[in-house]
């Protein structure tokens, strides 16, 4: 699907093997339209935004704010002012962890996360536990990577102030029932944040349908540039939360005695934004929409189903997470026999196959699974069944070496 839009996919690895890029859960490749748009802005429109009356600044500002509107429509946000640009999902979660805790939580108050969280949705809360004395509680999961919703319900107390969970596990591929998770939180009058880093690239997101209070995702995992991400937050919370950082562009007025802050979303966007990256993100979204989000999801789900089917024919294959492709996204973590994940990944690389190895920034999940790491293959819209066949053949070649 649209492989011709990604020049890097035609290169040879070690001057011999065609690139089989299956590390999309870490970052995706970028289509020419994104690269060309960013280059064009640097060449012809480069100027700081929000700060100039001259033509270039106004043109750059229009592109930057136009990107915000593109994001608003992409995830179906009611108000553009509820879209905050960040450096990525990690910064978005850190922003909420810092500012929400400052505004709404006290020592002994609790936040609920899950067993399958990325470190970016664990460490920020632990930092707040050390600073503010909040308590982090964890939703358990089954052996096949499904969250225990009954146990989740039992975690709520009168001190629970926030739930923050991943939409899709970056290790297991599990698609969590976020609408149910949010509904249960709201039944306890608790707001809920969703980490959408692994879902926004692969499925249509409607934050009003999910009814989450915060939603975060990254541009580079969905064919956009690095260093740009998005935090959606409901106005009623963002208005009460203090700024995450101070500096230019987030102020109303400044005196040596007191500073007032800009209106949303600028209160949370201190300093010069990466306005070239926001333009690139908008172009990536437009690229995905041009193909069709449902078409992308169907293609990747079929690819995942086929990969699960073919990989399970390999003796000693152990796949983590749900084996039903309907319950998971385009991520497959695996081990084969006693072969170390680093050995498998290194030898696959020698065949031109790019996969990710290690704990995938999810060490607590690895401990729950009783392992220290996996090999992870993750798919994007440009992957195909021939590449899955190459992966399976490569795994078999590696197995034959041990």
Predicted regions and their residues:
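Pyridoxal 5′-phosphate
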Residues: 1-402
